[in-house]
Amino acid sequence: MDKTQSSQGKCPVMHGANSAVASNNMDWWPKALNLDILHQHDKKTDPMDPKFNYREAFNSLDLAAVKRDLNALMTDSQDWWPADWGHYGGLMIRMAWHSAGTYRVADGRGGAGTGNQRFAPLNSWPDNANLDKARRLLWPIKKKYGNKLSWADLMILAGNVAYESMGLKTYGFAGGREDIWHPEKDIYWGSEKQWLAPTENPNSRYSGERDLENPLAAVMMGLIYVNPEGVDGKPDPLRTAQDVRVTFARMAMNDEETVALTAGGHTVGKCHGNGKAQDLGPEPEGEDLEAQGLGWLNKKGPGIGANAVTSGLEGAWTTYPTQWDNGYFHLLLNYDWELKKSPAGASQWEPINIKEEDKVVSVGDPNRKFNPIMTDADMAMKMDPEYRKISEKFYQDPAYFSEVFARAWFKLTHRDLGPKSRYLGPEVPNEDLLWQDPIPSVDYRLDASEIVDLKAKLLASGLSVSELVATAWDSARTFRGSDFRGGANGARIRLAPQKDWQANEPERLQKVLKVLTELQASLSKKVSIADLIVLGGAAAIEKAAHEAGVKVTVPFIPGRGDATQEMTDVESFAVLEPLHDAYRNWQKKDYVVQPEEMMLDRTQLMGLTAHEMTVLVGGMRVLGTNYGGTRHGVFTDKVGVLTNDFFVNLTDMAYNWKPAGSNLYQIVERKTGAVKWTASRVDLVFGSNSILRAYAEMYAQDDAKEKFVHDFVAAWTKVMNADRFDLA
């Protein structure tokens, strides 16, 4: 057999670029530090032109025209996926709900802000079954309005319009959600290896009695909220009520909002389980090429309309599922309910001895009627004492229920959009809401000479370089790019709860704030404390750079306001408390997760890259900003001077590194054995990890002294301005 014949039938593709075939570095070294979460969503994956500005594009959109098209869509039933009772409202609401419902308050990740429902794993979660059809129904509208309307905004707007088309007066709508172009790499959805894995399975998200792992909110892998059939699929409304309360609290919802959202979400639409789940094909990511991104296709028939299977439960919650009314509470509270099985075998609750007029007209045959149904979570609204009180109040006052729901729906769908300054469009409500973290606008300007004069006053105030830099950093480091909360704007570092956080060193903080407040009072011109905090850091860095022989001006744009305690929800802000800060070489206690992993997580939330992280850590060390003044990682004899000494000494082979305790190392001179410095894991990782070492070596070079300073200033400014949405 010749060479040509022997090669027939073999794959002609070199597999070096095929991630499905080749093992990657994390396969070989699973404990290695994975920096990928810092390198996602860059311009290489973004097809938009470099000058494209979504805010400008959205502001040119005729929102009223879009809403007219969406209203028309609601009742334009398509043969390939017919609308229940001729109305797509329930489907569109579920799509919007599940887009927003992945948000969790602990780390601000998830939510509706990026259009991530289009990508794996969310597009293939069991709880998102058949939402691929909802997005395909929306495609003609997305196609028509193009780049002026992101998928992320369209999905939420479609849910809003669906409610309006069925009679609810919504609270408002804001645009401004920009689409991503590939799945997020930073979101931890759980460690389970199978969908809907029960609690007792390995890698469970529960421990103890029923303690849900942080930062997760959903009870199972592949669910948005709770299991509709009960805890681990076993009906028990009171146990389910406990899950509901935890899950919704982790989405920043209280009991009243929880009941309103549960009832309002189930006032319209239906569950689908009129068939066999085993007849469904794979989810979208597991389907064949010809399915073109659709999943859950019925292999034994059309499986659409009255015969569709989604959750497995079958039926509507209310008598009139295409109109907004108070029917949910009428049925829930006025009937006794018993457990039944759906045609697909799912556990659901159905009323006993229901009146004919309260039954639901069949989707497929207007001459037939069926019982309404309730999930285990719905029954929790009746069985749990606190939920029951709220349900009865809503039942007795339908107008109040509608108002509470409209506000809770707005909160659900806008929670991760950030402060009101990021909201776009003509339907933005005028009211400032506490959960939006309001900040008063400023009414002053500072020219260049006034800024120079303020810097001089700050440097002459008696505060050290490290005190000024550390305070500015502490004020800004709370920013989360996940839900756009936190940051230096507002100067909430001087308010509860931040002023008392251990991470902020309250005693040192009060000393600095006292000096800044006295300086503010002495000025002839109005300047916010928020601006003074940031400007103090800038002045200190310029001084430290000058002493290192580098002249640099740290960019500063005034305009930050000072929030009041009344504008600050203490409980809501508690989730922003730092429990670790690699940049100041501190963690509250030892954790299961390694310090360097926590550093990556915080860095990603702040929107920084790996090289920005590197240069900031190196600069913060030599500026002497360590928590409590510790010397770990301070590889310099010139503390307070912005040199590249951290990197020079980290990469110097004259030293050896030895463990000296938990998260503690000694840097020893090879020749003498003398201990030169001490360090933590987050110091040494910049010499250990091959990628971070490459950055460290670059900054240690003899020609990098000025570059180091300028890169540090650029990264610093990025952190200080992360929440300046007025500058976008």
Curated annotation (Swiss-Prot):
Q: Tell me, what is an example of a GO biological process annotation in this record?
A: cellular response to hydrogen peroxide
Cross-link Tryptophyl-tyrosyl-methioninium (Trp-Tyr) (with M-251): which residues? W97-Y225
Please indicate which residues carry the site annotation Transition state stabilizer.
R94
Q: Which reaction does it catalyse?
A: H2O2 + AH2 = A + 2 H2O; 2 H2O2 = O2 + 2 H2O
Q: What is its EC number?
A: 1.11.1.21
The record places the cross-link (Tryptophyl-tyrosyl-methioninium (Tyr-Met) (with W-97)) at: Y225-M251
Residues that bind heme b: H266
Q: How is the cofactor bound?
A: Binds 1 heme b (iron(II)-protoporphyrin IX) group per dimer.
Domain of life, per lineage: Bacteria
User: How does this polypeptide assemble, per the annotation?
Assistant: Homodimer or homotetramer.
Protein name, per record: Catalase-peroxidase 1
Q: What is the originating organism of this protein?
A: Shewanella sp. (strain MR-4)
Question: What lineage is this protein's organism placed in?
Answer: Bacteria, Pseudomonadati, Pseudomonadota, Gammaproteobacteria, Alteromonadales
